[in-house]
Amino acid sequence: MDITVLFKLTYGLYVVGTFDGERPVGCIINTCFQVTSQNPILAVSLNKNNFTLEAIRKNKRFSLSIIAEESDPAVIGSFGYRSSRDCDKYEGFGYDVVEGAPVVKGQFAGRLILDAMNFVENETHYVVMARLVETVKGEGTPMTYDYFHRVVKGKAPKNAPTYVAEEEKPRQEAAHASDGKKHRYQCIVCNHIVEMEGNLPDDYRCPLCKATKDKFERVME
């Protein structure tokens, strides 16, 4: 079965935020859709290993910020490729509290505040059925997952429902390219790919996840 056909399904990108006690936590998801028209209920997919899911199961109330093409891409790196168990994902961005849920500051296409109603267990993910509590208008064009792949040049984190392990391509250390030609380098943290002449600068950081130069490998064509 060719599961790459699934790549033709359309998705967005969203920041989910909630409180773990008094501490704001959050993550990036790509699967959210409205399932009722009146008294709206939404379905949100979260990985079983996701710390944010644990917090939502306890707290019930959470926010969903709709990422726009104009949003700071660093938000995707901070919230998408690290765990709230180990770090403060809101550091460098800040947050506001809307109806009891944290929302990361910045430009987004809109915000939703939701209350989790029930949790439907599947093999790798829970589908959270949640009642809409409040909305906040935003600005910008909602970012699709296709735009994320083509323009931002990012790839799905391993906790995403759309994640598929790709065949490894031969690579070599980023520091080995000094011939002045254009080369492609891939971040081993978030899989972001950058094209640049010669070597990456010593102080280079990934625009998505802020990883340092030593976390990049040259992609052999």
Model-derived segments and spans:
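Basic, polyanion-binding surface patches
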Residues: 1-182, 189
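Short, intrinsically disordered terminal segments enriched in charged and Pro/Gly residues
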Residues: 176-178, 218-221
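Residues immediately within or flanking Cys/His clusters that coordinate Zn2+
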Residues: 182-184, 203
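Short cysteine-rich clusters marking metal-coordination/redox-active sites
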Residues: 187-190, 206-209
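Short Cys/His-rich zinc-binding micro-motifs
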Residues: 190-196
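Short linker/helix segments within small regulatory modules
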Residues: 196-205
